[in-house]
UniProtKB/Swiss-Prot annotation:
The RNAP catalytic core consists of 2 alpha, 1 beta, 1 beta' and 1 omega subunit. When a sigma factor is associated with the core the holoenzyme is formed, which can initiate transcription. This is DNA-directed RNA polymerase subunit beta'. GO terms for cellular component: DNA-directed RNA polymerase complex. The lineage of its organism: Bacteria, Pseudomonadati, Pseudomonadota, Betaproteobacteria, Burkholderiales. One of its GO terms (molecular function) is magnesium ion binding. One of its GO terms (biological process) is DNA-templated transcription. SMART domains: RPOLA_N (SM00663). The gene is rpoC. It comes from the Bacteria. Keywords: DNA-directed RNA polymerase, Magnesium, Metal-binding, Nucleotidyltransferase, Transcription, Transferase, Zinc. Belongs to the RNA polymerase beta' chain family.
Length: 1409
């Protein structure tokens, strides 16, 4: 059998491999691959269409054209297999060998490989320590390189031009050797002794930074050559391999023309130039001609390998650049992404989808014709098994005839055989789900309405693809893991994904609303059956308030059985009838309310947590059926009269008009600037629009009705438009506002707001101008959507690439590290409760009761709903939980650190690809994020105008650690901290709210004061930023000179004058002096900061209005100057998608803020032109200083004490700084919070876990600081797991381990720097990745998912993980067995050997080895 397989040269499935290695091929290796040299550029004979001998398609070299038939036709058929025909020299074998047999071309002159020359950094340059420019000049015959200086003063590696060369020849004669072209470079490479070079470089890793960097780079490349055993001269080609002909085919078109692969053209050029050069060399042609031909050959080889990399790309007949070997593998349509990662699959079909309201959740409707085609193989085998057809051909005929028996068989085959439905774009794992097919007439696939949310599908012409899992294993996986009824939660947030929408919601909402004085109000019923009869008889209406006796099932804690319990409930007719579908164990109180979309979602969630998956799926299906039925019965209609325009609208508009007029007046008389006028006008109209919409909603919301006592009362409106918006079925308050309020402000395409609003609404109709303004912004929206989708897809691709190899590989890594979680409170509101943040995580340490100190949860315990309720009751306000970032698993993550699998509700399983899930969860809502946040005039500018802060709850006042304040002469407390916060705690010391207070605010409360809700905590002037003194004294101006550093401004209206600090860029002279104030005491001595010898110096920033006079007495807390807010440039907030990408790419923000490098005291040093020197002196006297541009806003002053990592210069923080100064946990918190802010704005829920997983991947490399006794180089980046393994090994041998520090890489960079070169090459920059990998002789251990997909194995995740682990265990056992046998044999031999030794004593010394 084995020999038979050998004959057919087929791979047996046992050929397992655990790694793939890449390297560089030596000339000998290339020749060993080859089956013969290609000598002629011809391809095929134009008359016979047979390949030319020795040509690019030669049958003698590459194999026969037809299976088992030689070219001349002498030998045909299988019996001559393996014979080589003596006439045409072709081996008789399968034609398939033409896909795998390579040829070669012997180059008449060596040529450099362009990848190693031009791919930056140039590897040739690094090895030779020459510049790329010089090497190019030598290679392309523009200069000579000295290969052997002999006794002359010339330097080896020296470059000389043609003229220099001639001069030196005259001077020194034949003393020295200098060469041109690749030969010269090759000789230099051969002369390099890598060992010696490495020794030299290792000793030379000192000196200037630039030199060290360069040496380290060179050292890395040389070490790579040494380690991989690759000789540097192999970077110069002597032999060129020729690709097998079937991979660069020549295809006849009709009309006698041929379509050919570009590679044939490129090879032809190489062969032509090569043979021409060979002829010239034989003829001993003049040097200059040969040289030119060599250069042409080098260029031809370059184009073949990577066309267009150097110089102009070679073009074909139609002026288009030819596609070279490099182009074949890189880019979206290259080998990696087109064929290895994105394959097309058989047994699939696609069609339009329609709604299938009668289906169960796990079913889909499959058109009969489609099913017949998809399930053909199963039908054929069934027909044969039943004896209806004897051959496949007969079965085919039978199926095509469409006999009744075929349809019966189809019904049989389809039973219990799930199919997979997929809707593009597949943004997360719920984009492919499995269903059981139900055969239907027609040609459209029917889809269950509840899964539309997961697929993001609607029925306006969407198409879906169907795939059939063939093998039993595939069917089993589809059934257990992918069936729609097993995927009811979103993996991103753990919320239910099978939530009804649109008409279902409307129907349920309408049926569960209550009406005052409805027919039948006050009746009491014995059971729901009676209610139904009353409704049918018209005695009670759907919304009437009634009482009814219901049976509730509660679970008995002891037995686990359900126990019935009846009680009388006040409800409405509609709700009572819906109660029949509640699953056992779900109390009626969940349903006894008007069911809006959110409520229904909560209902399904509660059902899933309390009653489990099966009951929930059945319940959801029943809800759906009822919703459709009720919506139909409700008979909704919308009329134009339902859009009620509020009567107060005219008055509000008139008031706004008047205010705008006033602003215009002020502008004309010069009181406000143009910018202020625009902002204020936009503000006024924004507010007017909000007011109109408020009175409109108030009017829509209620309707008058008569109660049973004949009194007129208000009840919630039954207005159709209002009900649609209120229930969450369709539309929103913003849309109703456009229908019945006013359209409001519109945006221009550049995002700025047009200051004249549209005062009309759609009911009144728009005039031409208003309509035109509307179209402006609407078109921008469409253009944006197209861009957004592409950007979002690219973000997802980068995220998937960086996390694709992160899989849960063990149960528990045993760490006790974690991160402290507490509720997120902003501006006094809880944005995210503690419950949301810790649900489904694992406790990292004991959770104690805050008062009794009793243990509420052990470390390692999963925090589920029940436990969290206990914690909330006990008043726990912070919990240390395990996170993905602190997990200590080497490869992958552990289940405990990850916590709950959000998509399934239990602890995560081993083998779950949590990295990909995280990437999809973050990328999938990407399309919903806005590209650019419109600076909505109304909301954005008004939010900034807060001028005080008030308490929202009762409690005790506290301040945060950085809060500092002084008491001024009036006895008020003035805040002088930049990041001060007021914290309000309840009597248990739990934080209730937290408010940021700006610098210069006046506090109206003291620490530990008990306050009531509504108390004003602090006031400040919102339009200016003050500069305040902390100490008392007399003002002494320095450098405050009118006309030089300050200018006098006279207010036109009041006639008062103030001094304004001029921008240094605008000053004529005195650019470097800084206007400032010193304080002097009564004796005229400068006031010093207590405890230091620094004088109190307060600098004025550009644009500051000086409020004091020279010589004026001031007290602490007094304002010296004010900076108008208008003068401050408002930072443009990047929002939406670009912000998320910026965070994950770890880019430094423009105008970034500066953090204190160490804890210490601030002082200002000597200033330079346009910059301020900022110094920090730590307690040990170490000084750190930095130059800060003058226009930056410095937040600290002379003598202030700052902590490491505190913001000292205003601006957005740089993640790199946060990591360096504050550590991993703080960085993770920063990125998680910032990303969540963007998503929260759009109302998207994503669990923090997913973002943490990505941050973990961004931190997976470390930079070596001190290599210790390892082989690393200082400054080298290595995988964290690798350095940990190395250090363990070093410590075991008692050697000095390497020290390292964390480094944060952006996601693109992190993907490219993974250990797997296959994964990196298939992502981006394929050429660079492969070049680097080849030199290093890299081994890809195939740990990630992507590498395994590319080599075509099961991925090591999910069911594949178990398969790979079992396989590796089996290999290890076989290996152990083999070793045991070998050892036994060796022992036998040894024992035999000792017998001989006894006989032959004098020979014993030799045999001892």
């Amino acid at each position: 059998m084995k020999s038979l397989l050998d004959l057919f040269k087929q791979f047996t499935p046992d050929e397992h491999f655990d790694a793939i290695k890449i390297g560089m091929a030596s000339p000998e290796k290339i020749r060993s691959w080859s089956f013969g040299e290609v000598k002629k550029p011809e391809t095929i004979n134009y008359r016979t269409f047979k390949p030319e001998r020795d040509g690019l398609f030669c049958a003698k070299i590459f194999g026969p054209i037809k299976d088992y038939e030689c070219l001349c036709g002498k030998y045909k058929r299988l019996k001559h297999r393996g014979v080589i025909c003596e006439k045409c020299g072709v081996e008789v074998t399968q034609t398939k060998v033409r896909r795998e047999r390579m040829g070669h071309i012997d180059l008449a002159a060596p040529c450099a490989h362009i990848w190693f020359l031009k791919s930056l950094p140039s590897r040739l340059g690094l090895v030779l320590d020459m510049t790329l420019r010089d090497i190019e000049r030598v290679l392309y015959f523009e200069a000579y390189v000295v290969t052997d200086p002999g006794m002359t003063p010339l330097k080896k590696f020296g470059i000389m031009s043609e003229d220099d060369y001639d001069a030196k020849r005259k001077e020194y004669g034949d003393e020295f050797v200098a060469k041109m072209g690749a030969e010269g470079i090759k000789e230099l490479l051969e002369g390099i002794d890598i060992e010696i070079e490495i020794e030299k470089l290792r000793g030379d890793l000192t000196g200037s930074e630039v030199k060290v960097k360069k040496n380290a780079k060179r050292l890395k490349v040389l070490e790579a050559f040494k380690k991989s055993g690759i000789k540097p001269e192999w970077m110069i080609l002597e032999v060129l391999p020729v690709l097998p002909p079937d991979l660069r085919p020549l295809v006849p078109l009709d009309g006698g023309r041929f379509a050919t692969s570009d590679l044939n053209d490129l090879y032809r050029r190489v062969i032509n130039r090569n043979s021409r050069l060979r002829r010239l060399l034989e003829l001993k042609a003049p040097e200059i001609i040969a040289r030119n031909e060599k250069r042409m050959l080098q260029e031809a080889v370059d184009s073949l390998l990577d066309n267009g990399r150097r110089g102009k790309a070679m073009t074909g007949a139609n002026k288009r650049a030819l596609k070279s070997l490099a182009d074949m593998i890189k880019g979206k349509s290259g080998r990696f992404r087109q064929n290895l990662l994105g394959k097309r699959v058989d047994y699939s079909g696609r069609s339009v989808i329609t709604v299938g309201p009668t289906l169960k959740l796990h079913q889909c409707g499959l058109p009969k014709l489609m099913a017949l085609e998809l399930f053909k193989p199963f039908i054929f085998s069934r027909l044969e098994a039943m004896g209806i057809a004897t051959t496949i051909k007969a079965a085919k005929k039978e199926v095509e005839a469409g006999t009744p028996v075929v349809w019966d068989i189809l019904e049989e085959v389809i039973k219990e055989h799930p199919v997979m439905l997929n809707r593009a774009p597949t943004l997360h794992r719920l984009g492919i789900q499995a269903f059981e097919p139900i055969l239907i007439e027609g040609k459209a696939i029917q889809l269950h309405p509840l899964v539309c949310a997961a697929f993001n599908a609607d029925f306006d012409g969407d198409q879906m693809a169907v795939h059939v899992p063939l093998s039993v294993e595939a069917q089993l996986e589809a059934r257990t893991l992918m069936l729609a009824s097993n995927n009811v939660l979103f993996p991103a947030s753990g919320e239910p994904s099978i939530v009804p929408s649109q008409d279902v919601v409307l129907g349920l909402y309408h049926a569960t609303r209550e009406k005052i004085n409805g027919k039948g109000e006050g009746l009491v019923f014995a059971d729901t059956g009676e209610v139904q009869r009353a409704l049918d008889a018209g005695e009670a209406e759907l919304h009437a308030k009634i009482s009814v006796r219901l049976t509730e099932w509660t679970k008995d804690k002891a037995t686990g059985e359900f126990v019935p319990e009846t009680k009388l409930v006040d409800t409405t007719v509609g709700r009572a009838l819906l109660s029949e579908i509640l699953p056992k164990g779900l109390p009626f109180s969940n349903l006894n309310k008007a069911l809006k979309k959110k409520e229904i979602s909560k209902l399904i969630n509660a059902s899933f947590r309390k009653c489990g998956l099966k009951d929930t799926v059945v319940f959801a299906d029943k809800l759906l059926q009822n919703g459709f039925r009720l919506a139909t019965h409700a008979g909704f209609s919308v009329a134009i009269d339902d859009m009620l325009v509020p009567p107060q609208k005219a008055e509000i508009l008139a008031r706004a008009e008047a205010e705008v007029k006033e602003i215009e007046q002020q502008y004309v008389s010069g009181l406000v600037t143009a910018g202020e006028r625009y902002n204020k006008v936009v503000d006024i109209w924004g507010k007017a629009g909000d007011d109109v919409s408020k009175v409109m909603m108030d009017q829509l919301k209620v309707q008058k009705t008569i109660d049973r006592n004949g009194k007129e009362v208000n009840e919630e409106s039954f207005n159709a438009i209002y009900m649609m918006a209120d229930s969450g079925a369709r539309g929103s308050a913003a849309q109703i506002r456009q229908l019945a309020g006013m359209r409001g402000l519109m945006a221009k395409p550049d995002g700025s707001i047009i200051e004249t609003p549209i005062t009309a609404n759609f009911r009144e109709g728009l005039n031409v101008l208003q309509y035109f303004i509307s179209t402006h912004g609407a078109r921008k929206g469409l253009a944006d959507t197209a861009l957004k989708t592409a950007n979002s897809g690219y973000l997802t691709r980068r995220l998937v690439d960086v996390t694709q190899d992160l899989v849960v590989t063990e149960d528990d890594c045993g760490t006790s590290n974690g991160s402290l979680m507490r509720a997120i409170v902003e501006g006094g509101e809880v944005i995210e409760s503690l419950r949301d943040r810790i649900l489904g995580r694992t406790a990292a340490e004991e959770v104690l009761h805050p008062e009794t100190r009793a243990v509420l949860a052990q470390p390692g315990r999963m925090l589920d709903e029940d436990l969290i309720e206990e914690l909330e009751a006990a008043g726990v306000d912070e919990v240390k939980v395990r996170t993905a970032l602190t997990c200590e698993t080497r490869y992958g993550l552990c289940a405990k650190c990850y916590g709950r699998d959000l998509g399934r509700g239990g602890l995560i399983n081993l083998g779950e690809a949590v990295g990909v899930i995280a990437a999809q969860s973050i990328g999938e809502p990407g399309t919903q994020l806005t590209m650019r946040t419109f600076h909505i005039g109304g909301a954005a500018s008004r939010a900034a105008v807060a001028s005080s802060v008030e308490a929202k709850s009762n409690g005790i006042i506290g301040f945060n650690a950085t809060m500092r304040y002084v008491t001024n002469t009036k006895g008020e407390l003035v805040v002088i901290a930049r990041s001060g916060e007021i914290i309000i705690q309840d009597e248990h010391g739990r934080e209730r709210e937290r408010h940021k207070v700006p610098y210069g605010a006046t506090l109206t409360v003291k620490a530990d004061q008990t306050i009531k809700a509504g108390t004003i905590l602090a006031n400040w002037d919102p339009l200016t930023r003050p500069i305040i003194t902390e100490y008392a004294g007399t003002v002494k101006f320095e450098n405050v000179e009118e006309g030089l550093t300050v200018a006098k401004q006279v207010d036109e209206v009041t006639g008062l004058s103030t001094l304004v600090v001029i921008d240094p860029k605008r000053r004529g002279s005195a650019k470097v002096v800084r206007p400032q104030v010193k304080l002097v005491d009564a004796d005229g001595k400068e006031v010093k900061i207590p405890g230091t010898d620094h004088s109190v110096t307060i600098g004025f920033q550009v644009g500051a209005l000086i409020q004091v006079r020279d010589g004026q007495e001031v007290g602490p807390g007094e304002v010296l100057a004010r900076i108008p807010m208008e003068g401050q440039k408002t930072r443009d907030i990047t929002g939406g998608l670009p912000r998320v990408a910026e965070l994950f790419e770890a880019r430094s923000p423009k105008d970034k803020g500066m953090l204190a490098e160490m804890t210490g005291t601030i002082s200002f040093g000597k200033e330079t032109k346009g910059k301020v020197r900022l110094q920090i002196t730590d307690p040990d006297g170490k000084v750190w200083d930095e130059l800060v541009p003058k226009e930056k806003n410095v937040l600290v002053h002379e003598g202030q004490v700052v902590n490491k990592g505190e913001l000292i210069v205003d601006g957005p923080a740089d993640p790199q700084d946060i990591l360096r100064l504050l550590g991993i946990e703080e960085l993770s918190r920063y990125i998680v919070d910032e990303v969540q802010d963007v998503y929260r704005l759009q109302g998207v829920k994503i669990n923090d876990k997913h973002i943490e997983v990505i941050v973990r991947q961004m931190l997976r490399r470390v930079v070596v600081e001190n290599p210790g006794e390892s082989t690393y180089i200082a400054g080298e980046q290595v995988e964290r797991s690798e350095i940990l393994n190395t250090n363990e090994a070093l410590q075991a041998e008692g050697k000095l381990p390497a020290t390292y520090s964390n480094v944060l890489l952006g996601i693109t960079k992190a993907s490219l720097s993974t250990d797997s070169f296959i994964s990196a090459a298939s992502f981006q920059e394929t050429t660079r990745v492969l070049t680097e990998a080849a030199i290093m002789g890299k081994r890809d251990e195939l740990r990630g998912l992507k590498e395994n997909v590319i080599v075509g194995r099961l991925i090591p995740a999910g069911t594949g993980l178990a398969y790979h682990q079992a396989r590796k265990a089996k290999d290890a056992m076989d290996e152990a067995e083999r070793r045991a046998i070998a050892d036994a044999e060796a022992a036998e031999l040894a024992s035999a050997g000792t017998d001989d030794a006894a006989a032959e004593i004098d020979g014993s010394a030799d045999t001892a080895d």
